[in-house]
Amino acid sequence: MKALRFKRNIPRYAAAKIAGNIMPGSGASFGPIDLIQGESPEAPGKDWVKVRPRLSGICGSDLATVDGKSARYFEPLVSFPFTPGHEVVGNLDDDSRVVLEPVLSCTSRNISPPCTPCGAGNIGNCENVTLGEISSGIQTGSCHDTGGGCATEFYAHPSQLHSVPDEFSDEAAVMVEPTACGIHAALAAEIPNDGVVAVLGSGTLGQVTISALRHFTNPKTIISTARYPEQKILAAQLGSDIVVSPEEILRSVRRVCGTKAIANVSEKSPDGRVDRLTGGADVVIDCVGSSKSISDALSITKPNGRIVLVGMPATVELELTPLWHRELQLIGAYTYGTEKLPDGETISTFDLAFELVKTAKLEQLVSACYSLNDYQEALKHAANAGSRGAFKIVFDLRDERERNIK
């Protein structure tokens, strides 16, 4: 077996953080992640099945780990060493193709009765991520026992697997999991009919969120921010009515919503600098998760509006007075589970994701494929995808020479 392996190594983690601050993605060259070759792993339990990845996507959470930027909040929720990778399309032993739903819920941990969230179908909120028959881990790709998608093989519980329709390409299938995240965020936003929604960030997560908003909700206007030309073009194609640079978002929301602006007068800006609005968008979905993006969201959301944080944040510094003064709702949108559609129907997020990937042709977001041997270059490409005109970067393990290392 060949696999990427992330170990607990504080000095190398610190080195990765320094390198990642200099050049995003370069933590792969200095941090505690290595390409290893070894014996095939043992199944974590009798019901678990072996999956041989075909494509495995690189997620923003993977990049945060590689560059030493992931929150220490997760330390007790993972088990070392682990193999990253949770955006996976692969083959079972009978060669049928499956997509992984990576959350390690009560069902996969053989815990009965399930916790309240799992019992309600909200497996992303499982309360037992450190318990049961397998080691700690919120998802495949953070659990020592299961392995992960950045390998020639790993194990999954049958409850985690979804069959891939024959008409789906591998590139379409590998987009199902990230698309499910965008759908969950779009539906969690509870956008009023004919409301105004702003999406901050137009990387992969921003793009699938825009697509989900257009297909499953009914906003009057979608405004999105994009930094690079390719992002702007695709955001418009997938359903954004207005695409602006991050620096123009306040002005754009002001124009669309017809709200007033407030100037902040200071010694550095004696004539005043507009940095907030009296009104704003009904909902803002933050697909970045930085101090700047959350601060922008607080500035452009109308009083009693809602901010949905879907981009994974780390440690941020924020002025939270607007949250209090404007009585805003700030909620997180993590993974997926069971969704409630505007018409009251309940349905699996992954069922919706298969539908949306097909309808919106989201396989177009897959920009480049790399072998595991080239993992350092792949991670650097993924970390700088926007500036290089790319979106989703994946590992390609379809070549049998990749799967059968002598």
Regions found by a protein language model. Name each.
Residues 39-56, 71-120, 124, 165-167:
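Glycine-rich beta-strand-centered segment in the early N-terminal region that forms part
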Residues 75, 86, 106-200:
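NAD(P)H dinucleotide-binding glycine-rich loop of Rossmann-like/cofactor-binding domains
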Residues 187-192, 215, 276, 299-300:
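Glycine-rich helix-loop-beta junction characteristic of Rossmann-like nucleotide cofactor-binding loops
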Residues 196, 220-222, 306, 329:
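Residues at the starts of beta-strands that form the adenosine-phosphate
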Residues 199-202, 207, 214-292:
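Adenosine-nucleotide cofactor-binding segment
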Residues 236, 291-355, 396-406:
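Glycine-rich phosphate-binding loop and adjacent beta-alpha segment
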Residues 254-274, 278, 317-368, 377:
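C-terminal substrate-binding/catalytic core of Rossmann-like NAD(P)-dependent dehydrogenases/reductases
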Residues 272-273, 295-298, 346-406:
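C-terminal hydrophobic helical "lid"/dimerization subdomain
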